[in-house]
Amino acid sequence: MKKIIICFIFVFSINVSFADATSELIDKIKNIHSMTANFNQKLIDGQTNNNLNSKGNMSLKKPQYFKWITTSPNHQEIVYNGTKLWIYDGDLDQLIIKKVSNDIAQFPYLILLSKNTNNINKLFTVTAQDNNSYILKPKNDQMIDSIKIKFTPNNQLEYLEISTSLNQFTKIEFNNVKTDVDISNTSFDFKAPQNTDIIDETKSA
């Protein structure tokens, strides 16, 4: 009987720990009402041993606006306004317009938006670490192995790390971070340059 009680207490304490970590993470993300930053991104492909470094800038505004612009080595933009998702490749002069997507497997940084933040406890098991960081393990997603979110001591976003089932590892480091800045909603509407090849998937059946 004593063993059963001890096991119950152990399991209960683990569940409480996960719940506390999830609540802490949700509170930190919810406190980011708007944000701009520069980023440096490193992609390591374990299958090919190739590394790809890129950099750019991003902005977000709760509850639904997001912009991710890669400036080097190629020009790419991902813009999300809660209704449409624009994916622009400047080198290919191609724009893909998608229906609203909350696909965290494809776009892990969308976890910073309100709708996805509220669903963290449904999508992930969250573990807190000592250095103001959190490990998120998907409950169902087959593509992502884990996401690590690290905050600075004053709770600004410091970096994201994403490990996938394809043996790929991505680290996104943020700098020049500014939070609670005034950003116009219209800055999240994308207008394609002239002569862009546009693939509009929102018009498909």
Curated annotation (Swiss-Prot):
Similarity comment text for this entry: Belongs to the LolA family.
UniProt record, GO biological process: lipoprotein localization to outer membrane; lipoprotein transport
Annotated protein name in UniProt: Outer-membrane lipoprotein carrier protein
Signal sequence range: 1-19
Main location: periplasm
Summary of subunit composition and partner proteins: Monomer.
Keywords assigned by UniProt, alphabetized: Chaperone, Periplasm, Protein transport, Signal, Transport
